């Protein structure tokens, strides 16, 4: 559970909807840290004194459940507070009492174009990645909470980034937080 008075913002969303970009802009504006699977894996590697390859072997051998490992570390980050948790990692924390939960979505073609540009892959491959990611996220939320990840009742704010640029999305969230300070 987060410490009282400490901001913890979750920004889960669809692959290619701009979760990382929005989280980064928001964190810069508010002086918060961005947390995602990459940050968590780096922390695990440092804390355990292991390598990425050794960690991958432990996970692939079934010695440890990857999602449980990521979730436990993410819980430590939200306990510390002053973080924006983004992407798939944020989906693992939807059951936690946090400051704000913002879901980012966008049209599939828009997301595929972003993924193709970012990863320098063709649009067909990007579409497949978007579809795989949607299915992975669907299964994850269903497994953890027995709900659809597209159930808007899970989130406080929902933003369509195919219509609202990431800079504006970050500003909307920042403004919401300022207006709703207790």
Positions of the model-derived regions?
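Small-molecule kinase domains that catalyze NTP-dependent phosphoryl transfer to phosphate-bearing small molecules
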Residues: 64-65, 123-169
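Glycine-rich phosphate-binding loops of nucleotide-dependent enzymes
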Residues: 23, 34, 44
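Post-Walker A helix-loop "phosphate-sensing" segment adjacent to the P-loop in P-loop NTPases
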Residues: 28-35
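Pre-Walker A (Motif I) flank of P-loop NTPase domains
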Residues: 4-9
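Conserved phosphate-donor/acceptor-positioning beta-strand/loop module used by diverse small-molecule
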Residues: 97-119, 123-132
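ATP-dependent small-molecule kinase phosphotransfer cores
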Residues: 37-85, 89, 109, 121-122
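Glycine-rich phosphate-binding P-loop
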Residues: 11-26
């Amino acid at each position: 559970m987060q410490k009282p008075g400490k901001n913890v913002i979750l920004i889960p969303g669809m692959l290619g909807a701009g979760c990382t970009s929005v989280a980064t802009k928001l964190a810069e504006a508010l002086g918060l840290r961005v947390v995602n699977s990459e940050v968590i894996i780096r922390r695990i590697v440092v804390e355990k004194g292991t390598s990425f390859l050794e960690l991958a072997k432990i996970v692939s051998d079934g010695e440890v459940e990857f999602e449980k490992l990521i979730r436990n570390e993410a819980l430590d980050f939200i306990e510390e507070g002053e973080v924006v948790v983004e992407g798939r990692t944020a989906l693992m924390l939807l059951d936690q009492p946090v400051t704000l939960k913002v879901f980012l979505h966008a049209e599939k073609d828009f997301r595929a174009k972003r993924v193709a540009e970012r990863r320098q892959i063709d649009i067909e491959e990007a579409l497949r990645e978007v579809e795989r990611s949607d299915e992975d996220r669907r299964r994850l939320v269903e497994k953890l909470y027995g709900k659809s990840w597209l159930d808007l009742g899970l989130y406080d704010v929902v933003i369509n980034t195919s219509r609202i640029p990431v800079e504006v999305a970050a500003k909307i969230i920042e403004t919401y937080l300022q207006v709703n300070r207790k």
